[in-house]
A protein has these predicted regions:
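Juxtamembrane membrane-water interface segments that cap and precede transmembrane helices
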Residues: 22, 195-198, 232-242, 395-400, ...
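Hydrophobic alpha-helical segments
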Residues: 1-30, 306, 310, 422-452
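Alpha-helical transmembrane segments of multi-pass integral membrane proteins
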Residues: 353-459
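Membrane-helix interface and helix-disruption motif detector
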Residues: 28-39, 341, 399-404, 461-467
Length: 706
């Protein structure tokens, strides 16, 4: 008598469920910090999952997964609280060792990273955990180097790891917990020897840029260590728009190449198989250490070791279980890495490969050459499909030709990367071998040329506002069904995939409907990083934006969240100097005009003096001269007067006293649109102009007759 067995709807993998519950626990805890009402859906998820396990009588598994779920909450709380410890010390002495030096783009300004930081207040010393971000102003030479011990008087504050409902992932990634600023003339520098790894990186950087040039040398350095500070904006944009920016970051692709080479040679040696495994473990751990335990490198290393270990134990390797184990290990130690784009892309690419390649493997190709070609093309397609939602949601674009260019570029890169690693080792031993760098130079030049050509093609990339959460979930569900991890057969499976993808496309379409400004009045908004005006013609102007690197990144994120692709102008009133390259790149990306006074501190870097309109980095720049702009300076603030679409505007910068208000009435004797974006602004006449307090004002008339 045959036993009646019922096929499971989903191919059950405990590690996958555990990884998913850990992820949900971390995400819910982060959301709860921003909105306490998120406790409700977090509880609903726990109850629904518990009921499911009770029905299936999986009591032990329920206990394990609920423990992991709550563990996700716990480790997230500990992480956030570690960064939330209040620290604001006036006039303290900070002493720290420089671990990183980056030129900010402002003249004489550098961003440093301090480690082993000690602060001293009234002879009481306190050691700080983590690292500290330090901005140094007025640097007159390049005397600051990695390894130096720097001390100086400052005010130090802690970094909020969750800010504006989002995770400051860049700070978290580098374990930066505090920030401060120092004046170069008030610091003392004690030269110190850098570590072996720091010497290795510095020497490699110098060798590559010297023998391969700034462009190729910078790319090669990024490929080796994941540090993209030497790559200029144009190169970065070209690689991004062509769809090969992933090769610039040390990732699983790089680990895979090195692992394959080492594994091949170890198999040729007459060594015990466990000694070979130990050699692989030591090599991969060392590589992770050099790459500062980048999540993508750690993920790839864990999966490589799992693959070898299962073979040693005579077991069958399961890709989904392997990637889930890697996810669990990384998130247990660094839970907020879930919000790191590199982490997401690394797992997305592998997930795509696992799910899509299962479909390709069903075709039994007899011709070995054809099979290898199909395999290579399939991997490129699968990885691009796997990371498609992540790229759309994180970067706001889709590279149209990414699959095709990766088919061409990856084989070239597969030759370039191992050669670069090997030749770089020889050059580190002796510069006599530097001539060998001509080979990787030629290969990378070829990749750059291909990237430039593809990015210049029509419709090379499509700007989007992202796919959104619902469409992303539906997209990956369709991938799981296609990969055979959901047991549906024949037409039902096909219809399920089509229906799921159609729903995903529908939500993507809804998510990408641009924002329309339909007010007949003016919208004035004040934000930590900018103030803005929407005119009655639906023009959008941003005023005195935060020009720091963090400010620009945050502003891009805010505009993306508001579904704004184009703005009409950046208006600068305050005379603060800023990085001309950062602002120019921003203006180019958002197709906007820059307005600033002729005597603005940054005007010489942006403009050709004497012309009203000039070209700079493909971005149109305008500046006001004194014929079209007047400024009125008062005790505490300044007012700038200018025209937008033949309408006269006054924009204030500063908080005015009552005495100032009386002077403003005497100076301005005609109807204007008055915009103030400072807190506690005063009334002009008998009307309250604007009290920002970080609120959004819709349809608020700003016409004030004075």
């Amino acid at each position: 008598m045959m036993e009646n067995t019922k096929e499971r709807f989903i191919n059950f993998r405990p590690l996958v469920i555990i990884a998913l519950m850990l992820c949900i626990g971390v995400v819910f805890m982060v959301e709860i910090y921003s909105n306490i009402l998120m406790v409700i859906p977090a509880g609903v998820v726990a109850v629904v999952f518990a009921l499911f396990c009770f029905i299936k009588k999986k009591y032990i598994f329920l206990a394990i997964t609920m423990f992991i779920y709550l563990l996700g909450f716990g480790i997230t709380v500990l992480t956030i609280e570690t960064y939330s410890k209040s620290l604001s010390k006036e006039d303290c002495l900070i002493i720290g060792r420089v671990s990183d030096v980056v030129y900010s783009g402002y003249e004489g300004q550098y961003y440093l990273t301090f480690e082993n930081v000690v602060i001293e207040v009234e002879d009481a010393k306190t050691s700080l955990s983590g690292k500290t971000s330090v901005t140094v102003y007025g640097v007159v030479n390049d005397d600051i180097t990695v390894g130096d011990i720097i001390s100086g008087k400052t005010k130090i504050s802690n970094i909020n790891i969750i800010e504006d409902n989002s995770v400051n992932i860049n700070y978290y990634h580098d374990d930066i917990r505090y920030y401060c600023s120092l004046s170069f003339k008030n610091i003392s520098i004690e030269n110190n020897n850098p570590s072996v790894i720091e010497k290795l990186k510095t020497t490699t950087k110098d060798n590559l840029t010297k023998h391969m040039g700034e462009e190729v040398g910078g790319i090669s350095y990024a490929v080796l260590f994941g540090d993209k500070s030497l790559i200029d904006y144009q190169t970065s944009t070209t690689f991004r728009e062509s769809g090969i920016s992933h090769i610039l970051a040390v990732s699983g692709l790089h680990v895979g190449f090195l692992f394959a080479i080492l594994y091949f040679f170890l198999n040729k040696l007459p060594l015990n198989r466990w000694l070979k495994f130990l050699a692989l473990f030591i090599f991969l751990f060392g590589f992770c250490f050099v790459c500062e335990f980048s999540p993508s490198v750690v993920r790839a290393s864990i999966m490589c070791l799992c693959l070898v270990l299962t073979r040693l134990l005579g077991k069958q390797y399961d890709g989904l279980s392997g990637i889930s184990l890697a996810f669990i290990i990384i998130v247990l130690f660094r839970p907020l890495f879930i919000y790191d784009v590199g982490f997401q892309m690394s797992f997305g690419a592998v997930l795509g490969s696992i799910l899509i390649l299962k479909v390709i493997d069903r075709f039994d190709l007899k011709n070995k050459t054809l099979k290898n070609i199909v395999s290579g093309v399939s991997i490129s397609i699968a990885t691009q499909i796997g990371i498609l939602p992540i790229i759309a949601n994180s970067f706001g674009y889709l590279a149209t030709y990414s699959v095709l260019i990766n088919i061409v570029v990856i084989p070239i890169f597969a030759i370039f990367y191992p050669l670069l690693c090997i030749i770089n080792l020889f050059v580190l031993i002796s510069n006599v071998f530097s001539f060998l760098l001509v080979v990787p130079f030629a290969l990378m030049k070829t990749i750059v040329a291909i990237s430039s050509f593809v990015s210049s093609l029509p419709y090379a990339y499509i700007e989007v506002f992202g796919m959104g959460l619902i469409s992303t979930i539906l997209f990956y569900i369709a991938m799981f069904v296609l990969g055979g991890f959901v047991n549906l057969k024949g037409d039902i499976k096909t219809l399920s995939i089509i229906a799921t993808l159609c729903l995903s496309v529908m939500f993507v379409t809804i998510n990408n409907i641009p924002k329309k400004f339909t007010t007949n009045n003016f919208i004035v908004e004040n934000n930590t990083y900018y103030a803005s005006i929407n005119t009655e013609n639906n023009d959008l102007y941003l005023i005195d934006i935060d020009t720091s690197k963090k400010g620009i990144e945050k502003l891009r994120s805010i505009l993306k969240g508001k579904k704004i692709k184009q703005i009409d102008g950046l208006i600068f009133i305050s005379n603060t100097n800023f990085s001309s390259s950062e602002i120019s790149n921003f203006a180019k990306d958002f197709d906007c005009v820059i307005y600033l006074p002729q005597n603005h501190a940054s005007a010489p870097n942006l403009l050709l003096m004497g012309n009203d309109v000039v070209e700079y980095d493909d971005s149109k720049m305008l500046y006001f001269n004194f014929g079209t702009m007047q400024t009125f300076t008062y005790q505490k603030g300044l007012i700038a007067e200018f025209n937008i679409n033949n309408k006269k505007f006054l924009i204030s910068s500063g908080v005015f006293s009552e005495e100032d208000v009386l002077k403003i009435k005497n100076d301005i004797l005609y109807p204007v649109h008055f915009v103030s974006y400072d807190e506690n602004s005063y009334s002009l006449g008998d009307k309250q102009i604007f009290n920002s307090n970080y609120h959004l004002y819709y349809g608020e008339k700003c016409d004030i007759v004075i």
